Amino acid sequence: VNMPPGQAHKFHRHPAMEEIIYVISGTAEQWVDQTKQILGPGESAHIPTNRVHGTYNAGDTELVFLAILSPAIFEGPALVDVSEDAPWSTLRDE
């Protein structure tokens, strides 16, 4: 994923998939549930199945990262957007 400054994958969840975020370059503000961590190149985060999470470009340069989701085959929605729901809509200033 190539994410320009100020862009994001806002809060969402994957009902049937877990995800690993691996930062190649730039700075990611990674949320898993209501916990935030800052990730730099070579760092990663694991998001368990059905956990709310969001990835934000926290830097002034492009954020480049791998988003690895598993399993690849499942039934139901791949992504559920919760960015407008409480408490997710109030966790950060935009």
Per-range role (PLM):
Residues 34-50:
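Short acidic-glycine-tyrosine-enriched beta hairpin
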